[in-house]
Structure formats: C-alpha cells, structure tokens
C-alpha cells in the first residue's frame, strides 16, 4: 500500500472523533440532495404510471386545436366541441366506442359544510363516461350517476370531506347544484385521485348544463377506442372527418401531454425549489468542511513537518490530506445517500401536512440519482480541503518544526489582497444591486449584484471578524467578568477561523431573512392593494378556476344587491384571452357599477363607454404596449379572434388587474362563468357585523362562499404567503443545523488545540463552571457574528428582490421587526446550544494532563 494512503488512513482513524462534525455536515447535505432527486424520480414515475394506467383503454382523443395559455391552468384553455361530432365518430368503421367528455371546475362541499380542496390543486367536475375502458376513473363503491343530481366522487375527496354513499351535499360549478353521492371512484386501478386534485362526475346532461355556458350541445373532448385498429391507424381513420380547428391525437400522445401538463410544470418547479435548498445546505457544509480541515491541518503542522523532514515530498503531504478528504467525503456521501431515502419520505410527509398530497407508488431511483450525490459530496469534501492541503504542503520542514497550530489571522500581503478583493466585490455589487432594484427594474442585474455582495461579504469575513466580535462582545466583561473577557478574546483571537465558522450560519440566516422580508413585503403589498383599491365594506370570495376552486356564482351579486342592508354588490369575474401571443387574464364586470366598490384611481376616457368591444387597460400595461385611448387591440379567444378598442385607462395595481372588459363583451367568448369575488357596499347606518351576517346568510344559498371584511379579505389573500414561509423555514432548518454543527465542531477542535491553555486556567483557579461558561459565550459570540451579519445581508437582499420583482412600482417594502427579532434570538440560543458539548468536554479535562499536554 502507498505510504501516503497508509498515513492518511491512520490519521483518519486517529482523529475520527474530531471529524464527526464534518461527516455529519456532508451526510446532511448529501441526504437532502439525494432525497430531492429520489422524490423527483419517484413522483415522475408515479405520475407516468398513474396516467398510463388510467388511460390504457383510450385509443385516440379528439379535441379543439384552439388553445389559449392561461395563468395557473395546466395545458391552457381549449374551445369546446359540438356534441354532434360524437355520433359522427361512432359511425366510423373500426371505431368500437366514442364517448364525449365534459370537463370544468366544480368544488364539493364536505359533510361539515366546508369546501373540499381549493388550496392550489384543481377541483374538477365532468361527466361520467359510461364506457369503462375509456373512463380513467373506476368505480370502487356504488354505481354510476343515472339521474339529475347524482354524482360519483373520487375516493380522496370523499375521504377528505367525510362523504359516503347516500350523502347529500352541494357542488359549486360555481352555481350551487344539490347532489347526492351514488358512487365513489378511484383514478386508474387504485389511486385516490388524480394527484391531489378532486373530481366530481355527473350525468352528461348535468355536466353540459352546469359546466358549459354555450348550450347543452357542447363537450370538451371525444375519447375513442378500437378493437381492430392501432392507435395511429385510428387517428388516421378519423382525421379526414374532423372540421377545421379540431385535431386528433393518439391515446399515448394525449396521456403524455396530460402527464406533462399536470406533473411536468409542477414537478419542474417542485424539484428546482428543493434542489436550490439542497444547494444552500451543501454550500453551508462547504464552509464547515473547509474550516475543519484548516484547523486539523494547522494542528498537525509538526506532524506534516516531520514527514517532510523524513523525505516526504510536497505532493505526498498534499496527497495525504486530500486522500483523507476523499475517503471522508466518499464515506459520508454513502451514508447521506442512504439517509436520502428517509429525507424523501420526510419531504413527502411535509407536503402532505400542508394539504398537498402527492401520488403514491413504489420508490424509483435512477442511476444519476445515485452517482450525482456521491460525486457531489465527495467533490465538496475534496474541494473544501484543497486550500488547507496546499497550505500544509507549502510549509517548509525546518520552519514547521518550530511552530504549532499555525492558522493565524489573515496578515500581511494576503490580508491586503483579501481586503481589496472583498471591497471590490462589495462596492461593485452594491451599486449594481441598487440600480437593478430601482431603475428598470432588472431582476438579472439585481441578482448578479446580490451574488457579488454575498461573495464579497464572505471574502471580507476574516477582515471584519475581529472588530465585529469585539464590538458584539463589549458588554461581556462587565456582565460576566473575567469569564466574559476571555470568551470575547478567544472569539477574536483567530478572525479567519471565526469568520469561516460564522459564515456558514450567516448564509443560512441571510436566506431565512431574505424570505422573511420578501414574504412580509408581499403581504404588505396585498394589504396596501386592498386598502387602496377596495372601496367596499365586504368581499364574498371563493377560490377561482386556476387557483384550486370554481369561483363564486355570477348570480350571487344580483341576489346580494336585493338585500335591504346592501347599497351595491358587484361581481368581479375572470376571463382569458391571447394578446400579442401571450395568455392574459381579463377582469370581467359591469364597469360603471364596479367604480362604486373598487377604486380604480384616475380614469382617462370612460368606463361607461366600454360596450361590447371596448377595453379598459391599466396605465402601466398601456405604456408597456404602446397603447393609448382609441388604440385597437387584437385579441384571440377560444372561439376565435376579436378586435377591442381601448376606451379607458386606469391606475391599476389593486384589486383589478391590467385588463377590464364588460360582461356584455365577455358573453360571446365565455367558457365557464365564474366570479372570483363579489364586492359589497353597505347602506348608511348598517353596521359591519349586521351587514356581514345578512350577506353570509344570502351567500349560503350559493354554495357558502365566505363573506369577509376588508381586513379579513386582505389577511386571507396573504394566507398563501404564510404557508410558503412555513415550508421555506422547514427546508432551511437543515442548512442552519449544518451551520450549528460547524460551530460545535470548530469549538471542539479549538478545545483540543487549547488543551494546555485551558489546563493552566484551571490551575490558576478557574472553576469548571467558569470554563464551561467561557466556551459557551465564545460559541454565542460566533453565532451572534453570523446571525447579525446574516440579518443585515438578508434584509438588504430582501429589499432588493422586493423592488426588482415590482415591475409596476406599486409594491410595498416591509421589515418585520418581530420576526427578525425571533430569528436573532433563535440564532443566539442555537449558538449557546452548539457550545454545550465543547464546553462540557473542556470542563472535563484533567488539570495535570492538560498542563502537561504539548
């Protein structure tokens, strides 16, 4: 065996306890990366299997070729088909069965009166397809719907809503439909549903009556099968009979597109998000690993020098250290790979806990999922150890024999170079970030500048560490006497080491702070938007199509207007059209009435003049498109193109979006009527509580949408932000844990390094309790440096991101002092906890052995 390999192996075994923190850091980082990749592989395979099983009997799908991109609607919005096409296709030779399919939004009310779903995943409704081979759903209990008001619901929705055979409830389409559950179905062979979505199946007549606004003779698609033709032959057979604007595709192609629409976008965002957090965890681990090897290498200066004196070359010393890192990285990566399966299960449970149930199935692992984490963990370990290894290899033998633990503060030319490079990055990145956030704004320039500031902060860490720790620890001598003074001095004595240890925590805290500030700013923007633009007293809301629900019935606003407590009630609907090749969301309302409950700011032109072909546009959107009053705007709807004229410009940035048309204009193009909210203004003399009670009683007859005050409406609009922050905090906890392991590991190594010094302190009268307190306070100071630096950096980056993302210039910036104070306190407390084990080890040192230590 090579001498370098033998020496490296013996060194690892001899110092294995010192490297436990490093191993743990790599294990956690690699486990997160592996868990993310395993979960992604598994979900993709589960979605593929789920859809393939459900659609196995479908040979071809006929649908409209006209499709519009729609925000939050996977696959976009397609035009409906004439149901007469179904009979025509049934008559084609070789077609064994042809069944119409109607799809729309429909949200069930559970047994407890609360809506089922509606928190993101779609709530779907459609007709029950009688041909079992063409129906992706399979009856698990009961029977198919045969009479008006009878429905089949997917098993997951029934379980969530406490529904069973014979249950009577309401289906919001969005008009309320009284229904009775006669069947419970699985998606495919045994899935509770199509992922986390819900599905309610009605008779074809009911589905056409409630889900298609243009009459009962329309369907969404026609599904075909053949007992004699292949899928490709079936498509070729029916294609010549299809009218213009209608297409046919094989069942396999339709399944692949459905899988991509439902799972592709979601999984792409899902796995990318998780990989970002895995990257943050590995970045934090990099600082911990580098610091550990820097300390261990410095502590072994005499050992390495002796090897050099005995004839070892620089390359052999370098190879020994890197070999240790390679072995350590490979071992820890292997353990992390195994732990990744547990992380995948934990991530799945985390999302299930917030109501986002993922499809079940066997675990799937691709080769890349094994190789990439192993390589990543090993490369991170070796790369982090490279600089300490090079430093060890460059040490002259005779000089090294006269030194011990050489890893001092950044001094001399190296310190000046570090200071210069760090200053260049910070003072170059700061203006770029500010300009990108305030001029334009430019997200690319902002992110580039922010990364430069982050890199510069890391580089300047050793330069700033001593001053920062002395400043933060200034009260300690007065509060804790000599113990506090020694803790402060110990934390500042090696700025390079302190900075490297604190930087890991700083990165984690900075990201936590960034998301906290950004989330608070989004909530403040929503609150200001409602306060500024919502002039009503109450809002009646339900999740809309594309946001997980079916919206509010358009019949509700007229019903509320008839209440004696109500002065005005105006429904605000949503539509979609293609403008300049891109799908745009349209607000649909009675423009003149809308002005009574929504403040649109200064209006140029006239809302009363919109009519059947008029358009009102926000000023920001009009400026971006080069439009003015009188401009003609070509639009494309699912039923074809239409030209609109800009007849009004308004402020925008509030409850109303960028495009507003009248209900008269939307009538020919509508797909499924729904309002996202009804804004209500009360009559003078009616109290808020009286008005809310009256409005809620009336709304209960329309599927129980929720009546809210302005403050409640603003708070509910921001509810998704709190959910997002909860997930982010849970994911970032791993990075912060790795950073705290780094602090504990560094202090443990420092205790070993300062054994003789600690023994002398005990010999001159320091008690065990004082020694423990000294080490704990040193840990707190390092954590304070990392936490305060992370808070400052994260707050700045949060401000920059908030401004850069606010292209309309109507957003608000908020600095949540309470939450940031909690982050600070948690950081300090975590620092104290990280110091417990090193402090206990220091206190257990035998005085005589410690004093005699070399």
Q: What does each model-identified segment do?
A:
Residues 2, 394-410, 843-854:
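Short cytosolic juxtamembrane segments of multi-pass membrane proteins
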Residues 2, 17-21, 25, 269-272, ...:
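Alpha-helical transmembrane segments, especially those used as permease/efflux helices
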Residues 4, 11-18, 278, 285-329, ...:
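Interfacial "coupling" helices/loops that link adjacent transmembrane helices in transporter permeases
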